[in-house]
């Protein structure tokens, strides 16, 4: 095994020979990262990406200045989907080491799960992986139910069944109950709902290759809320939380749903399908109906829902939508505490009416007359939240996955959002 490259921190600038903008320097003892006090965590993450790019796969974080957040920033930049990497961590106190270990276990699970090929990760596998992760941290405080295939249709989960029926891999609804109180009648504090489309071809509204090649990641919302619940549990979550994952493939076959089909939901809403590639909202609707029935204090849904959110924010921020200003402010405060990027986008009452249909109450996509695609998608979802004006947050996960590497991230999943949602749950 190769000897570890030592990585140390310094608050002094690099020697002038490295240039005035140098963020790291190399000497016989290893590599020094030169912190400037302005964006130290970002600097560490970007430097780690460069170190990995040099082919250095075994490092030792050495010397003073390392804490859990700085170690984590290094790992976020250092980790990549190909190859193996080894980090020898510095001495941390017990609380910081436990925090770091939990991030490594859970957020790496999120990244690895999102990066998994669709051939390996179908709807049933995603649901079972979620159960395994949360059971690992919660033990007997968890119960769950998995409903799949024709049972979904018989029980009225028509959005999920309609989208997923074309695949040989049956659609699945995971309903998981984390109840640390032990009281079956305990109120539900929060419900988490995740879009788990394990591959999205677009259906008959088929995607071009350039937009389909990353669609193994279309279950990023489900992975994110699963990781968030698991991480909140490790931080001492003592309230009852329910998790609903809406898992399916969106494929083409003789049995696939078609443009012009009308879906009737359990809350009485009828939706005309005018774009089979706007399938995420169709499956989330089923999960949101179940979440609303629990009468929780808050509902958080997460989904890689629209290209419009990425157009607005790139892959750098998650988009946040809510009618509840106070709750949105709490989530943004949690994001700031966890150093994760969220940005609130508009959601108003008029967005709820910008999905007109000639044949049903709602259309599943906005027309050219209503181009605010991310906002109208959120408006669509609001029709399936009983008290949508209070206690509901919608996260359009535009920062979940990167098709290509950038200066601070490798290609693939980021794991962003897990800590923010966990922070909100435990605040």
UniProtKB/Swiss-Prot annotation:
Keywords attached to this Swiss-Prot or TrEMBL record, sorted alphabetically, are: Aminopeptidase, Cytoplasm, Hydrolase, Manganese, Metal-binding, Protease
For this protein, what is the EC number?
A: 3.4.11.23
SUPFAM superfamilies reported for this sequence: Zn-dependent exopeptidases (SSF53187)
Q: Which cofactor does it need?
A: Mn(2+)
Positions binding Mn(2+) 1 in this chain are 200, 277, 279
Q: Which Pfam families match?
A: DUF3663, Peptidase_M17
GO:BP terms for this protein? proteolysis
The superkingdom listed in its UniProt entry is: Bacteria
Q: Which residues bind Mn(2+) 2?
A: 195, 200, 218, 279
- State the protein's name: Peptidase B
Q: Which organism is it from?
A: Shigella boydii serotype 18 (strain CDC 3083-94 / BS512)
Protein's gene:
pepB
